[in-house]
Curated annotation (Swiss-Prot):
It catalyses: L-cysteine + L-glutamate + ATP = gamma-L-glutamyl-L-cysteine + ADP + phosphate + H(+). This is Putative glutamate--cysteine ligase 2. Keywords: ATP-binding, Ligase, Nucleotide-binding. Its EC number is 6.3.2.2. HAMAP family: Glu_cys_ligase_2 (MF_01609). One of its GO terms (biological process) is modified amino acid biosynthetic process. ATP-dependent carboxylate-amine ligase which exhibits weak glutamate--cysteine ligase activity. It is an enzyme of class 6 (ligase). Signal peptide: none annotated. Transmembrane segments: none annotated. InterPro entries: GCL_type2/YbdK_subfam, GCS2, Gln_synth/guanido_kin_cat_dom, YbdK. GO terms for molecular function: ATP binding; glutamate-cysteine ligase activity.
């Protein structure tokens, strides 16, 4: 049971409520120099040339451009939305001698040469987090799914943790760190959790518990705004969504569509089961903590914990059953083809596996890894 008080007088957080399970996607890209393949701190100039565009955002570091979709009903609609923004953006980037690059981390870039975006909230973050904050050379994909009631948010979020290792293993794309093979499939997952309020969410049962938590965080000066809760899965109250932030950066639209479809189907499936008064599956937090580590370390070779009884199974074997169970949901959500494409990732190799193959084929030259990832982005 949570020890967070159920309610405080001024702790209320409005949740916007989404009448439909709409989706929105945030896709973070790094800028790399076309000649050196190293990171380029030119995002401010790129965004200025793109002009006022609600689909293109700046981020913490000046090597990063975030492309976002609008509010979409289906995965194909979201992918087309992103494609429409990416095409012109990439032309501008290429005209400036750079390429768009996406993975959980850059294979060899050094944090000491990266410049911060000029914004008070970023300056405050670095002032507080210091060395760890400056180390955040990481990129990810965030998927928002609309939820109709705040009363559903915590039960769905807690149950979604059971699928954390599946999503991380499939998307893992950060085996390298400053030129070194870390031995991990996703070093990004290990890095990001070093920031305050980041990492696995607390397993609250009610919205009131979450409100109490945020109240305490604000009162003690840990955060100023609810958006500073940086959990791997978190509510976005002003949007009326659950935001899945598990996935490493994804290099291509085919895999992105597959992972977004899997996320959409998982959330909607749990939502419908909750409406049918089913009890949603949960596990103790120590199992989720171990599953996160196993998926980050071993990727698709991870043996994960399945339930509160501590049963285990290879993540790819369990994934097959998950995909079969979600197939009817995907048909109703008009993303059956995209969900089926999830199986292509283990079949062809996840990004971390492909990156290591490229490095081996090029005698360890990590510039070739950057080239391979850049080439995967077909718009």
């Amino acid at each position: 049971m949570s020890s967070v008080p159920a309610r405080r007088g001024d702790a209320h957080i409005d949740f916007a409520r989404s009448p439909r399970p709409t989706i929105g996607v945030e896709w973070e890209f790094a800028l790399v120099d076309a000649q050196t393949r190293d990171l380029s701190n030119e995002a401010t100039a790129v965004i200025a040339e793109i002009g006022e565009n609600p689909r293109v955002h700046k981020e913490l570091l000046r090597n990063t451009v975030e492309v976002v979709s609008g509010i979409c009903r289906t995965v194909p609609e979201a992918m087309e939305d992103l494609r429409q923004t990416l095409g012109p953006a990439r032309r501008i980037v290429r005209d400036r001698g750079m390429e768009l690059f996406c993975a959980g981390a850059h294979p060899f870039a050094q944090w000491t040469t990266q410049k911060l975006t000029d914004a008070p909230r970023y300056a405050e973050l670095i002032k507080r987090t210091q060395w760890w904050g400056r180390q955040m050379l990481i990129w990810g994909v965030h998927v928002h799914v609309g939820i109709s009631s705040p009363n559903k948010v915590m039960p769905i979020m807690t149950s979604l943790l059971n699928y954390y290792p599946h999503l991380l293993a499939l998307s893992a794309s950060s085996p390298w760190w400053t030129g070194v093979d870390t031995g991990y499939a996703s070093n990004r997952a290990m890095m990001f959790q070093q920031l305050p309020t980041a990492g696995l969410p607390f397993q609250f049962q009610t919205w009131a518990e979450f409100e109490g938590f945020v109240y305490d965080q604000k009162k003690t000066g840990i955060i100023d705004h609810v958006d500073e809760v940086r959990w791997d899965i978190r509510p976005s109250p002003h949007l009326g969504t659950l935001e899945m932030r598990i996935c490493d950066g994804v290099s291509n639209l085919h895999e992105l569509a597959a992972l977004v479809a899997l996320t959409h189907c998982l959330v909607v499936d749990l939502d419908r089961r909750l409406e049918a008064d089913e009890s949603l599956p949960t596990m103790p937090p120590w199992h989720h903590q171990e599953n996160k580590w196993r998926a980050a370390r071993y990727g698709l070779d991870a043996v994960i914990i399945l339930d509160a009884d501590s049963n285990e199974r290879l993540v790819t074997e369990d994934l097959d059953d998950v995909l079969n169970r979600l197939e009817p949901v995907a048909r109703k959500l008009q993303c059956a083809d995209e969900l089926a494409a999830v199986a292509d990732i283990p079949r062809h190799g996840a990004s971390y596996q492909r990156q290591r193959r490229v490095a081996e084929e090029h005698d360890g030259d990590l510039r070739a890894v950057v080239d391979a990832l850049v080439a995967e982005l077909e718009i």
